[in-house]
Each structure stands twice: as C-alpha cells, then as structure tokens.
Regions:
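Catalytic, metal-anchored helix/loop core of enzyme active sites in primary metabolism
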Residues: 1-305
C-alpha cells in the first residue's frame, strides 16, 4: 500500500479522518514531512539506527518519536487511535495486527503476512467489524459476503491477473530478468510484492489469508486467472448465485472502503466503463509451471502457524 494514497483521505474527507500517528521502517524525511503536514503528534521507526537522523530536529517539541519494533506496536495503544492501517511489509507486521485487535481498535489490514504466519492467533481477536481487509481481492470478497449468511457460501473465486509471465513455459521462465518481473501489467506495488506476484507466490499467500479471514478451507478457494483485472474476486453461494466485485484496478478503492466502512465516500478513482471492455476472461492457473502457488496451497492445507 502506497502511503501517499492513504494520506490523500484526511484532506479529501472533511472532519472524517485525523492522522494521529505514523510508523515506518526508516523513511525519516518522508515521515517528518507528513507529520508536519497533518499535525501528527506520534512517530515511530522500526529501524533504531535512524535515531540520529537530522530531519528529526525539524519536528515540534510536542511530537513524540520512538524507535524499534516495540515503539511501532505501542502506537496501537494510544487513547486517541480508533483505526490502525497496517501496511508493514512481511511478518514484522504481525505484532501490530495482534496489538491493534487486542486493544479493541479497528484493524485495516494490508499486511497479509499477519494472517499467513499467525492467523490462528490473530483471528480469535477479530470480529466482522474490527478486521477490514485492504488487499483488493479480500476487500472484494468481504463486500461479496455483506448481507449474506457465511454458511451459505459454497466457494470463493480468487482472481489474479496472471502477472507479466502468464502463458510462459518453465524453459521460458528460466530466461526472464528481474526487470521483467518488476513490470506488473496491472498494479503498482513495491518490488517484493511485484516479484511475488510474477511467480504467483503472492496469490498463494492470499489464499492462506482468505482461509483465515473467511474461515474456509483451502479447497473451497479457487484461484482463477483474469487478465483484465476488472473482477476483483467472487463468492459463489449454494443456490448457484455468484456475487462479484468489479471496478477499476486502483488501490485507493479498497483503502477507502476500509477507512470509511460502513459508509462509502466519493472516490478520486476513475469509474469503470463497461462499454470499453471487449471481454472478461477466466482461466485456470498453470500449477505445473508456477510451483510457488502449488506450494502455498499445500501449506494452506497443512495449516498451523
């Protein structure tokens, strides 16, 4: 999740949002600039080596600054915090997710590793209204469940674009470059998630995330390649009905949904024009070529933390 996307909303939505605290690994200059722009009074940095960064001297005296993983997690306990958007990368985000829910705050979760690594620990603390997924696919599934009885869902259809290497053979994949892997056809993401998306590893992690979020088995989740990236995911019900969430591929939409729920705010994202779509394709993933997805499915079936 791009922090700049998130911070569009306090300016765009009058009196709805206030930035109370910000945390990052080591992006000191950026955090100081945002703290000054939004009047944020609490900062934390996971990397303790930035303690002496010159930019910190620009902060007002009433701004508290902490360093280390404990300082980042402590932000979730602040009295004036209502919702925590956790977009930390990797398993480092698990503690913030756990502490947020333990403190009774709303967790807007963009850190899938929290559930992949520790879903059995996190989910008992969550309710339907306190854990809101920010990943576009899981936000879509969440919205497809609204107004339904969960036990009447038959399966989840989890979509993916197929990445830049869709249709390639193993031999062809042995020749690809890092630059090609970083050229995702649909989403603008950080390098780690972009590479994981190219190998379909990220989609495998999303299956495990969905298992925990929606309390379903691995084999009740079908991954389907959808190159147009218009259908963000679907839920099929026992009566044969299928609810799908469609829209443009813009992360601002699921971010805003998590921040505004149970309401919907007007979005800066473009609106979808169905007349410009010649077709919507849905294909089986190549599990023999993209072994990362296969391994993730096996891990999901095995369970555990």
């Amino acid at each position: 999740v791009d922090l700049q996307m998130v911070l569009e909303y306090p300016d765009a939505v009058d009196d709805e949002l206030e930035v109370v605290a910000l945390a990052a690994g080591r992006r000191v200059d950026e955090m100081v600039r945002y703290a000054q722009e939004f009047g944020c009074k609490h900062l934390a940095f996971g990397d303790e080596t930035v303690r002496d960064a010159p930019a910190l001297a620009q902060l007002d005296d009433d701004v508290s600054v902490g360093f280390g993983a404990a300082a980042v997690a402590a932000l979730t306990q602040l009295d004036d915090v209502d919702i925590v958007l956790n977009a930390l990368s990797g398993e480092a985000g698990m503690r913030a997710s756990y502490d947020t829910l333990k403190a009774g705050r709303i967790l807007a979760l963009a850190n899938k590793e929290s559930l992949v690594v520790g879903g059995d620990l996190i989910m008992p603390l969550a309710t339907h209204d306190t854990l809101l997924p920010v990943d576009s696919e899981h936000s879509a599934i969440y919205q497809c469940y609204l107004g339904e009885f969960a036990n009447e869902a038959l399966r989840i259809w989890l979509t993916c674009s197929g990445g830049p290497f869709r249709g390639m053979t193993r031999d062809e994949l042995s020749q690809v470059t890092a630059a090609q892997a970083l050229a995702h056809p649909t989403w603008n993401m950080g390098p780690k998630i972009t590479v994981d998306s190219a190998t379909l590893m990220n989609k495998g992690l999303e299956v495990i995330e969905a298992q925990h979020l929606f309390d379903v088995k691995t084999d009740d989740i079908r991954v389907v390649v959808h190159p147009q990236s218009c259908v963000h995911s679907m839920v099929e019900y026992v009566d044969g009905s299928v609810k799908a969430h469609l829209g443009v591929a813009d992360m601002r939409i699921p971010i805003q949904f998590a921040l505004s729920y149970p309401h919907r705010w007007e979005s800066p994202a473009a609106q979808v024009d169905f007349t410009q779509m010649a077709s919507l394709e849905f294909l089986d993933p190549d599990l023999d070529t993209f072994r990362c997805l296969t391994l993730a499915l096996e891990a999901g079936r095995a369970g555990g933390t």
